[in-house]
A protein has these predicted regions:
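Glycine-rich phosphate-binding active-site loops on the catalytic face of alpha/beta enzymes
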Residues: 6-17, 65-70, 112, 153-178
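A short, Lys/Arg-enriched amphipathic alpha-helix followed by its capping loop at the start of a domain
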Residues: 3-6, 33
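C-terminal helical cap(s) of enzyme catalytic domains, especially alpha/beta-barrels
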Residues: 23-32, 74-76, 162-193
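C-terminal active-site rim and adjoining tail of enzyme catalytic domains
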Residues: 135, 139-146, 151-164, 177-185
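Conserved anion-binding
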Residues: 10-17, 21, 25-138, 142-146
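Residue-level signal for inorganic ion chemistry
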Residues: 1, 63, 106, 161, ...
Length: 193
């Protein structure tokens, strides 16, 4: 993905996810991507000790929290962090930005019962308030077929994809990744021009 132009890759460390990777696999990945881009570690309601044990073995640049973690919890690791916000019609993004003012970004993701992201479903992009997009990473149901429209409408700082570039759960498809990255880059260029 990084060789194709992605800015970051993510490893899921939440044991309840079908996309979770072991510490050994993540350490191997980190050696392969060193210097190419950011490596992000995804956690869901895990203890500080669990997060730290990953950091002791895997050189993550950024942490991504998808559960009910507080700002104080997220900050304690002295790394940039992204806080996922499950999107529904009643989410107040101004309040979320204030509650996680130390976050590098807020990742806006769709809500699906019993899942913490990776559902493959979009949320209504009109819920993203104008002027709050500079620290927003848009996620939730994105693929090469809709990422350009998403970027054009929301104008987020970045986009995040998982299921939209998979052959099957946890297995990425190179052609889908390439198409997604090309569509995202083209849409971002159109906005800049």
């Amino acid at each position: 993905a990084l060789a194709m132009g992605a800015d970051a890759i993510g490893c899921v460390f939440y044991p309840g996810s079908r996309r979770a990777v072991s510490l050994d696999v993540a350490a191997d990945i980190s050696r392969g991507v060193s210097g190419l881009g950011m490596m992000v570690g995804l956690f869901v309601n895990q203890s500080a000790e669990e997060v730290q044990s990953v950091l002791d073995r895997v050189p993550l640049h950024t942490l991504q929290f998808h559960g009910g973690e507080s700002e104080a919890f997220c900050q304690q690791f002295n790394r940039p962090y992204i806080k996922a916000i499950p999107m529904s019609g009643d989410v107040n993004l101004t309040e979320a930005h204030l509650a996680y003012s130390s976050a590098a970004a807020l990742l806006l993701d769709s809500v699906h019962a019993g899942q913490f992201g990776g559902s493959g479903q979009c949320f209504d992009w009109r819920w993203v308030e104008a002027g709050l997009n500079e620290r927003v990473i848009l996620a939730g149901g994105l693929s090469s077929t809709n990422v350009a429209a998403a970027i054009t409408q929301v104008q987020p700082a970045a986009v995040d994809v998982s299921s939209g570039v998979e052959k099957e759960v946890g297995i990425k498809d190179a052609a889908k990744m390439k198409a997604f990255i090309e569509a995202a880059h083209a849409a971002a260029q159109d906005i800049k021009s």
